[in-house]
Regions:
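Glycine-rich, phosphate-binding/catalytic loops in enzymes
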Residues: 34-36, 69-73, 157
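Hydrophobic alpha-helical membrane-association signature
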Residues: 33-36, 101, 202, 244
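C-terminal alpha-helix plus adjacent terminal tail
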Residues: 1-13, 62, 74, 80, ...
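Crotonase-fold acyl-CoA enzyme core
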Residues: 107-221
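Terminal peptide-recognition signature
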Residues: 18, 22, 36-37, 55, ...
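Conserved CoA-thioester-binding segment of acyl-CoA-metabolizing enzymes
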Residues: 1-60
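Glycine- (often His-adjacent) and acidic-residue-rich active-site loop
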Residues: 25, 57-104, 152
């Protein structure tokens, strides 16, 4: 199975539905899958008949984050991170790769000039947050749990570090300090999600909301989204995201130094194993 088969694209009466369909791996993300997701986002953005975009996943969990096996199950065998023939990496290799493969995707999805809605069920871990946080609205099933446990790897948080904006400073710190989870109800109280619904109503509720939004004038929707996003940027959102991305890479640099230039994925896994936090 190639990576493109993990992403589905459908249109339902002016609503594009992008589905990550890899339930057997808890919708873990590889380089190929992220590229295919980005292609789907671009397709929806460029379709004049689409007014609203919905992001969903299949199975019990929204996403387990990055695929930490280090191998992309696509036909060309693309790896999760950058590679050099000698097996050694420089800090800038990983910085450039994550800029293109993670940060720029999240930024582009956030700024697509159409309303976007994420439907989240089960666990949403680490890079899973980078799928739902760029969306304008989030509908969570009552069993949803949000976490970013990458502190266990010596990293201060995922690449798109929107924690403070999504949860507020104290709840963001608790999530990062403890590697614990934020429940759907806690996320609702923090303003991170818009609605919490029973799991069996997640799809229908999200699509009803999307079709309701699609009834609004598309130019008004575009300007309303731009106004809110621009207000956040004026308050420092984009600058903070850039600064935190740099801090994120200080963690990777530390891992590279500690392991003599091994790939960061392997260095991070070794760190977790040494701490007894993974098998």
């Amino acid at each position: 199975m190639t990576a493109q088969h993990f992403v589905r694209y459908d249109v339902d009466d002016k609503v594009a539905v992008i589905t990550l369909d890899r339930p057997d791996a808890a919708n873990a993300q590889t380089a190929g899958i992220l590229k295919d997701l980005d292609d789907a986002w671009r397709r929806a953005d460029e379709d004049p008949e689409v007014r609203v975009i919905v992001l969903t996943t299949t199975g019990k969990h929204f996403s387990a984050g990055h695929d930490m096996t280090g191998v992309d199950p696509s036909a060309d065998g693309r790896a999760l991170g950058p590679r050099r023939t000698d097996g050694k990496l420089l800090a800038e290799d990983y910085y450039d790769w994550e800029t293109r493969g993670y940060l720029e995707y999240a930024r582009r999805w956030r700024d697509i000039p159409k309303p976007t809605i994420a439907a989240v069920q089960g666990k949403c871990i680490a890079a899973g947050l980078m799928l739902c946080w760029p969306c304008d609205l989030i509908v969570a099933a009552d069993n949803a749990q949000f976490s970013d446990p990458v502190g266990l790897m010596g990293i201060m948080g995922v690449e798109y570090h929107a924690h403070t904006w999504e949860l507020g400073p104290r709840k963001a710190k608790e999530m990062l300090f403890t590697a614990g989870s934020v429940t759907a109800e806690e996320a609702l109280r923090s303003g991170m999600v818009n609605h919490v619904v029973p799991l069996d109503e997640l799809r229908s509720f999200t699509m009803t909301l999307a079709h309701r939004v699609a009834q609004t004038d598309p130019w008004a929707l575009r300007l309303a989204k731009r106004a809110v996003n621009h207000t956040m940027d004026t308050m420092g959102f984009s600058t903070a995201i850039d600064s935190c991305f740099d801090m994120h890479h200080l963690g990777h640099i530390r891992a590279l130094a500690a392991t003599g230039g091994k790939t960061v994925v392997m260095a991070d896994l070794e760190r977790m194993k040494a701490a007894g936090r993974t098998k």
